[in-house]
């Protein structure tokens, strides 16, 4: 197998792992995400000049899925119930201080939960 094919396979596996983490316990969305990933990889399976860019894009998508996607769950049957977020260990956590000062060099020395 060629190097781009091996990298593409690795990127595809990263996306599958990321979808498993991001959409745990949501079979419908998990299957739809994996189907879309498969469709995109099948659509671009010919090796070309832009292959490294496409592989890099797939790796970035996997990272976003793994670190930035949080799903909300509302208990069934209770309309007054509040939504609960499924936050897992890989989720990137920030705080309001980092958002308020975006683009500036800032060092935050406190924990997010403090």
Swiss-Prot record:
Claim: Nucleotide-binding is one of the keywords in the record: no
Task: Indicate where this protein resides in the cell.
Answer: Mitochondrion matrix
Q: Which GO terms describe its molecular function?
A: protein folding chaperone
Q: Does the keyword Mitochondrion apply?
A: yes
User: Which keywords label this protein?
Assistant: Chaperone, Mitochondrion, Transit peptide
Its biological purpose is as follows: Assembly factor required for Rieske Fe-S protein RIP1 incorporation into the cytochrome b-c1 (CIII) complex. Functions as a chaperone, binding to this subunit within the mitochondrial matrix and stabilizing it prior to its translocation and insertion into the late CIII dimeric intermediate within the mitochondrial inner membrane. Modulates the mitochondrial matrix zinc pool.
Q: Which family would the database say this protein is a member of? A: Belongs to the complex I LYR family. MZM1 subfamily.
Please give the subunit comment from the record. Interacts with RIP1.
- Please report the name of this protein according to its UniProt entry: Mitochondrial zinc maintenance protein 1, mitochondrial
Q: What is the lineage of its organism?
A: Eukaryota, Fungi, Dikarya, Ascomycota, Pezizomycotina
């Amino acid at each position: 197998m060629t190097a781009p094919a091996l990298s593409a396979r690795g990127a595809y596996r990263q996306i599958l792992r990321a979808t498993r983490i991001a959409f745990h316990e949501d079979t419908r969305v998990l299957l739809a995400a994996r189907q879309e990933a498969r469709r995109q990889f099948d659509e671009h399976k010919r090796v070309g000049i832009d292959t490294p860019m496409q592989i890099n894009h797939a790796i970035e998508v996997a990272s976003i899925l793994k670190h930035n996607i949080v799903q909300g769950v509302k208990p069934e049957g209770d309309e007054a119930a509040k939504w609960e977020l499924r936050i897992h260990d890989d989720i990137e956590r920030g705080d309001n201080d980092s958002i308020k000062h975006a683009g500036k060099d800032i060092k935050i020395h406190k924990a997010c939960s403090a």
